[in-house]
Regions:
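Long hydrophobic alpha-helical segments typical of transmembrane helices together
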Residues: 220-251
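Active-site-proximal alpha-helical scaffolds that flank and shape metal-associated catalytic sites
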Residues: 80, 104-205, 237
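Intrinsically disordered, low-complexity segments enriched in serine/proline and basic residues
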Residues: 2-14
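Alpha-helical bundle segments that constitute or directly flank the non-heme di-iron/ferroxidase center
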Residues: 50-55, 69-99, 118-119, 168-178, ...
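Low-complexity, intrinsically disordered or signal/transmembrane-proximal segments
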Residues: 11, 21, 30-32
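Carbohydrate-associated surface elements
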Residues: 144-145, 206-210, 214-217, 235-236, ...
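Short alpha-helical hairpin
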Residues: 46-71, 89, 211-219
């Protein structure tokens, strides 16, 4: 796949503004001892991200991917950029293991890192081969603005040493993907490039991991509502931007 034209993807994505936020109000709601609201902290962040979350999981890119009608150009653009997250994403998972406060949580993050390093990375390589995208061609394709942003936010959250901030980014990165993948109609597309990307993000193990991420954020997030909200909303913005830029390139 030739690299010509990929630089046009660097246009910024504008016009997406999160709803207003009162930090003191949020802090008081989630620091009440015994409050059942802490069980729903992750859901509150998701609600605060609307309408961007819904726009992302219902984006035309996702709908066409699930239907198997997404153009190869858009899929190549998307996969090349997404594959570049893996290094930063593994750094983020490493930070999650380092900052988690339980042994069980560290084990879960370790197992997931193994899946990303193995099964998911292998999928990317198989998909690139099927789409005739050489390693040289991939190297000549520049990062888009959303890719730059994603790499930055993953490493930024990792360097905070805040388990809540790290969980906030992970909840978006994995939870939003489960949301759209679980909506895929049956049967799945015949092309494995589409079908396996869906099943990688909608299977029993992945659903269990996302549930774990939510429960961890519900548990520790209320103690740091501002930083969690900041990272969560910025990550949702980037997810929508990422779909939009790669979809637009194929048109």
């Amino acid at each position: 796949m030739p690299a010509k034209g990929w630089g046009s993807l660097s246009q910024p994505f504008a016009g997406l503004i999160a709803r207003p936020y009162n930090a003191e109000c949020m802090r008081s709601r989630y620091q009440q001892k015994g409050s059942t609201m802490t069980e729903h902290f992750s859901q509150t962040l998701k609600q605060a991200s609307e309408p961007l979350w819904t726009q992302a999981v219902e984006h035309s890119f996702v709908k066409e991917l699930c239907a198997g009608t997404l153009s190869d150009i858009s899929m190549v653009s998307y996969l090349v950029q997404d594959h570049r997250f893996l290094d930063s994403f593994l750094t983020l998972l490493g930070a999650a293991m380092a900052t988690a406060d339980t042994f069980e949580a560290r084990l879960r993050f370790g197992r997931f890192a193994g899946m990303v390093s193995g099964e998911e990375n292998t999928y990317f390589l198989r998909a690139f081969a099927a789409l005739n995208v050489s390693e040289e061609a991939r190297a000549n394709i520049p990062d888009t603005e959303p890719t730059i942003g994603f790499k930055a936010i993953m490493r930024e959250s990792a360097t905070t040493r805040s388990y809540g901030a790290i969980l906030s980014v992970l909840n978006v990165a994995e939870g939003l993907y489960l949301d759209w993948a679980s909506r895929a109609p049956s049967p799945l597309p015949n092309n494995f490039v589409h079908a396996e990307w869906i099943t990688l993000h909608d299977n029993p193990s992945f659903r269990e991991f996302v549930s774990f991420l939510k429960s961890e954020l519900d548990r520790v997030g209320p103690a740091q509502p501002e930083i969690c909200r900041d990272f969560f909303l910025r990550a949702v913005h980037l997810e929508l931007e990422f779909f939009e830029v790669n979809y637009r390139f194929g048109k």
